Amino acid sequence: EGSGNAVITKLDGLRKLGIRTPEILRPVFAVMNPELTYTLSAWQTASGITDMMAHIMERYFSNTQGVEIADRMCEGVMKAIVNEAPRVMSEPDNYDARANIMWAGTVAHNGTCGVGCEEDWASHGLEHEISAIYDVTHGAGLAVIFPAWLTYAAKHNVGKVAQYAVRVWDVPDSDDL
């Protein structure tokens, strides 16, 4: 992860707290080797992929207007994740799939996709409360929260949700969306 953020869990107080100190935490460089991810379990891989998508969606579903470049960057990275995730899950030692997922994860977490956008991290805050109390992997908790969150988002910005469906998931474009 290339962000300036971290999360600390305090087990005896059932608290999970985020800290943001980019000047200290953001790495200056990283050596990324997809082969080092081959032994990750399917569960951890899927949870990481879910977290990547969540980080991008929390930037993508912005109330900020006129950010087509950011939107297209988000859509491109999400589309790559959608394409590569099944390959990573079915072929855990596929170097190219792992490399693409690794790069997508870096971009998802380093803020590149959200430049100029108002961001909404409420879903992450909700998940932190869940995983502070229960033994839940972060990405798995987000997988539970995001369908409801997306339903909520559709009520407030149906056009953006339709755009997401068409551009990321290849749902046929329709005036009925």
Question: What is the role of each PLM region?
Answer:
Residues 1-69, 163:
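A glycine/threonine-rich phosphate-anchoring loop and its flanking beta-alpha core
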Residues 59-177:
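Active-site segments that bind and position negatively charged phosphate/pyrophosphate groups
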